[in-house]
Amino acid sequence: MHVVVPFDGRDPKTRLAPVLDAPERRDFARAMLADVAETIESISFEPTILATTDVECEWPVVVDERSLDAAVNDQLAVADGPVAVVMADLALVTPDALDRLFRAGGEVVLAPGRGGGTNAFVARHHDFRVDYHDASITDHRSIAEEIGADTVEVDSFRLASDVDEPDDLAEVLLHGEGRAAAWLREHGFDLSMDEGRVSVQR
């Protein structure tokens, strides 16, 4: 199975700007990328980083400057077998969570994200294509139905938890065990309780 990890190497994670400056966002994004890629390796698959610009890392990199949809759909179109796509900001991902995704039956296997996104999927049907705009999980369900694909969804807290907003950093500190969590702690982030709600402070 070809495993693809899309990554914005230019200006990643802009919604974290209230708490991280641009160089910090790049460093933190690369820490999350490493967590995801190493987790994929740990279950005996090799990740291919699908990046918007060249990225120095220990994994194969394919540079595609086009939109996320165009870049991923090209990977799907040229594949001669199953393709898995796992987003680079799944800082809580574990080998067990990915193994569940990869082993699940179905021609299309979807891992919904919080807020309506699609954080990972496996496509075993050659006609499946992506549309990541807006609530993409509903679009991907519809696309799978239109091509007649047998579709399975994997309900996983760790696959559903992507890191886009400052509030998401609390989940990384609470549940993360990899480089991203370590990076936050090394840069002065810790948990804070505010009226019973967990957040982060620096």
From Swiss-Prot:
One of its GO terms (molecular function) is phospholactate guanylyltransferase activity. Its EC number is 2.7.7.68. Belongs to the CofC family. Keywords: GTP-binding, Nucleotide-binding, Nucleotidyltransferase, Transferase. It is an enzyme of class 2 (transferase). This is 2-phospho-L-lactate guanylyltransferase. It comes from Halorhabdus utahensis (strain DSM 12940 / JCM 11049 / AX-2). Pathway: Cofactor biosynthesis; coenzyme F420 biosynthesis. It catalyses: (2S)-2-phospholactate + GTP + H(+) = (2S)-lactyl-2-diphospho-5'-guanosine + diphosphate. It comes from the Archaea. NCBIfam families: F420_cofC. It holds the Pfam family CofC.
